Regions:
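Extended beta-strand/loop cores of jelly-roll/beta-sandwich
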Residues: 1-18, 22-25, 30-34, 40-42, ...
């Protein structure tokens, strides 16, 4: 239940402050209308947990699948549906949450219940990421986010510079049935042969990429593919999309 409530807290925090004109927002290929996306989160629980796992014959609101099934509702159509209001959409989430919790057995659950519960909760977490990048795309100010339930661990990341050598040979990709949870695109586990390679210890940080920018990386075609350089030239870019430079130095939106 804590997993579900933590994911739900993030959904609410990332959407509750949106003004009415942003409940749908502009039609862009890389985002969903928040009012639809929140309902889709609810439908995922409604379908996989209440309907498939617990056997409820009816969804918690009428026409749920016609409105929120991402496999059946074309992306561009999501802005023109007769959607419930934002208030009613959040009520839909609350109804589903209560219905799920009331059916959760005491003590440890069986593996099927545990898997579906995790799948649906992690699905909501992924949409939390989508709400965050939608706000970034549309230049919305980020809201105040309460730390996750239980707090954040204080871990020293250590030195992030340098590379690590990965020897060639056979490596297992994906996850087998011995792990507690795996997404469908992580199975089955299979073995692949690789040549040796080196890779950075960590993903590229803003600080590291800033050195590339300040060293003239956006002015030197040697660091770009032909297609990438044409794109950079067409867009007249001097730095990444959300970077701005002023007297204080580089700032990132």
């Amino acid at each position: 239940v804590e997993m579900l409530d933590d994911a739900r807290q993030r959904t609410v925090e990332l959407t509750q402050d949106l003004p009415p004109e942003r409940h749908l927002g502009p039609k862009l290929s890389i985002v969903n209308p928040p009012q639809w996306e929140i309902g889709h989160i609810g439908f995922f629980y409604d379908y996989f947990v209440l309907h498939k796992l617990f056997g409820l014959s009816n969804f918690q609101i009428a026409n749920a699948s016609q409105l929120y099934d991402s496999m059946g509702v074309a992306h561009d159509a999501r802005w023109t549906l007769d959607l419930p209001s934002m208030e009613d959409t959040f009520d839909y989430l609350r109804i589903i949450r209560d219905a799920m919790v009331s059916r959760l057995p005491e003590g440890l659950t069986d593996s099927a219940t545990s898997y579906v519960w995790q799948l649906a909760t992690f699905h909501e977490d992924m949409h939390g990421e989508a709400f965050a990048y939608t706000r970034q795309t549309l230049a919305d100010q980020m809201p105040m986010i309460v730390p996750p339930i239980g707090g954040l661990p204080c871990l020293d990341s250590g030195d992030l510079s340098g590379e690590v050598f990965v020897p060639g040979g056979e490596h297992t990709l994906g996850a087998d049935e011995n792990v507690g949870f795996r997404f469908d695109n992580e199975k089955p586990a299979y073995v692949r042969a690789f040549d040796s390679f080196t890779i950075d210890i960590s993903p590229v940080t803003n600080a590291a990429f800033m050195r590339f920018v300040e060293a003239g990386g956006y002015e030197n075609p040697n660091y770009w593919s032909n297609r990438g350089w044409v794109w950079r030239d067409t867009q007249a870019l001097k730095a990444p999309c959300y970077w701005r430079y002023n007297d204080a130095g580089w700032q990132v939106r």
